[in-house]
């Protein structure tokens, strides 16, 4: 089989700072009013009273959705979405295009390495540039799968289990239990600036959910980089009587020594996890060395599927789990091939967590959601990532080449 070359790469955005609030899509933080994801949630900005009530108050939704589409010479296309908005479009159309167009559709690793190497001088340790590279990488995997007629998980070597089981992230673990999920992860609402009173309030929330959910249902806390090691350690011990399964991303990404200390002093049996906002393979290697229990890369932010596979190998070599930050189909196709991912995350994007809304709604069509907390591998048996782009969304292409 002679594989075609890539003819063109195109980039669109939707949502972001210039759009109406609530576009959703690849930037799932961009939700409308009265949504749990924009409630009073602890963040690194919570120490400033002007920005503690809402994550959108400090601009968490200003980037918007980036859509990258790659077209082969035979007319077939692949696409992906992430969070990078209009600035990501510029990077794709004015810089990364030269490494993509003219390459064979199977040259994914070559393109990936060239994109990483060419952006080192302005990418730093991740962020917007890495989000953009991730989106391109995912689009390339989607195109390759469509050209050869295989789902991405089969390109990675095939499934190691028949189904993926999920825990749910949202404000209502009790509802997640009713939907068949194996656990529920809640955001914390208080931080070091709130002192011991904040610890008591979040521990009381865990206690309340433990009473509602029973003893056998997993409960976890997502701290979203909002704490210091002393506060995190005290919170972990305050929640230990309620059988908290893990405490997540307590600290900013680069505080490796503090993660090491937190793991050393955490209650016996409680896992320490992180990785959502780490943006390079090297940062995950260092994070792994701290001894945390689970690494949680976001495939749309860490360098794409190509990097995620490498991160999983690092974790496996140390006996650690890799459970990606919820990324819908882009992580489904990966984790079903990983032996060290026994479960995965589903992010509840319905406003009150009472219904099953696809994570990237409305930008993806045919995006699967768990049924009774699970997705069978047969649901993934479509070429590429198995989803289509909703072109009825307000897509803008601000740059071309």
Swiss-Prot record:
List cofactor names only.
Answer: Mg(2+)
A Pfam family per the record: MR_MLE_C
Q: Which CDD domains match?
A: MR_like_2
Instruction: Please give a single GO biological process term from the UniProt record.
Output: amino acid catabolic process
Q: Where is this site: Increases basicity of active site His?
A: 298
Name the consequence of residue 325 to N.
Loss of L-rhamnonate dehydratase activity. 2-fold decrease in substrate affinity
Which residues does the Swiss-Prot or TrEMBL record annotate as the active site? 325
Task: Tell me if Metal-binding is a UniProt keyword of this record.
Answer: yes
Q: Where exactly is the site Transition state stabilizer?
A: 345
Recorded hits in InterPro entries, A to Z, give:
Enolase-like_C_sf (IPR036849), Enolase-like_N (IPR029017), Enolase_C-like (IPR029065), L-Rhamnon_dehydrat (IPR023444), Mandel_Rmase/mucon_lact_enz_CS (IPR018110), Mandelate_racemase_C (IPR013342), Mandelate_racemase_N_dom (IPR013341), RHMD-like (IPR046945)
Q: Which NCBIfam families match?
A: PRK15440.1 (NF011968)
Additional remarks: Reaction proceeds via a syn dehydration.
Self-association state and partner proteins as the record states: Homooctamer; tetramer of dimers.
Q: What does this protein do?
A: Catalyzes the dehydration of L-rhamnonate to 2-keto-3-deoxy-L-rhamnonate (KDR). Can also dehydrate L-lyxonate, L-mannonate and D-gulonate, although less efficiently, but not 2-keto-4-hydroxyheptane-1,7-dioate.
User: This protein is called what?
Assistant: L-rhamnonate dehydratase
- Organism field: Escherichia coli (strain K12)
């Amino acid at each position: 089989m002679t594989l075609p070359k890539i003819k063109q790469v195109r980039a669109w955005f939707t949502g972001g700072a210039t759009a109406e609030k609530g576009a959703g899509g690849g930037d799932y933080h961009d939700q409308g009013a009265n949504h749990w994801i924009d409630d009073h949630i602890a963040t690194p900005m919570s120490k400033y009273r002007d920005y503690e009530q809402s994550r959108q108050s400090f601009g968490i939704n200003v980037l918007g959705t980036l859509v990258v589409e790659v077209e082969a010479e035979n007319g077939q296309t692949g696409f992906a979405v992430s969070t990078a908005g209009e600035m990501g479009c510029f990077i794709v159309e004015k810089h990364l295009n030269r490494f993509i167009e003219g390459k064979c559709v199977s040259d994914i690793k070559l393109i990936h390495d060239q994109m990483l190497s060419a952006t080192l001088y302005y990418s730093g340790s991740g962020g917007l540039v890495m989000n953009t590279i991730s989106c391109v990488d995912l689009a390339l995997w989607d195109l390759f799968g469509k050209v050869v007629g295989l789902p991405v998980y089969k390109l990675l070597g095939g499934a190691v289990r028949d189904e993926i089981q999920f825990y749910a992230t949202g404000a209502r673990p009790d509802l997640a239990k009713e939907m068949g999920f194996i656990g529920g992860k809640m955001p914390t609402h208080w931080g070091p600036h709130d002192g011991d009173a904040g610890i008591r309030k979040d521990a009381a929330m865990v206690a309340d959910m433990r009473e509602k959910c029973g003893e056998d249902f997993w409960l976890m806390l997502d701290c979203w980089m909002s704490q210091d090691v002393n506060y995190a350690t005290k919170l972990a011990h305050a929640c230990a009587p309620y059988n908290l399964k893990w405490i997540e991303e307590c600290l900013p990404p680069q505080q490796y020594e503090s993660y090491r200390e937190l793991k050393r002093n955490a209650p016996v049996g409680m896992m320490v996890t992180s990785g959502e906002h780490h943006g390079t393979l090297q940062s995950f290697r260092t994070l792994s060395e701290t001894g945390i229990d689970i690494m949680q890369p976001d495939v749309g932010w860490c360098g794409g599927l190509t990097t995620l596979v490498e991160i999983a190998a690092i974790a496996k070599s140390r006996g650690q789990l890799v459970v990606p930050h919820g990324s819908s189909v882009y992580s489904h196709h990966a984790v079903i091939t990983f032996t060290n991912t026994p479960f995965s995350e589903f992010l509840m994007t319905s406003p009150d967590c009472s219904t099953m809304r696809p994570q990237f709604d409305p930008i993806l069509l045919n995006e699967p959601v768990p049924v009774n907390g699970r997705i069978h591998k047969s649901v993934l048996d479509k070429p590429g990532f198995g989803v289509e782009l909703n072109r009825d969304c307000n897509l803008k292409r601000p740059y071309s080449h």
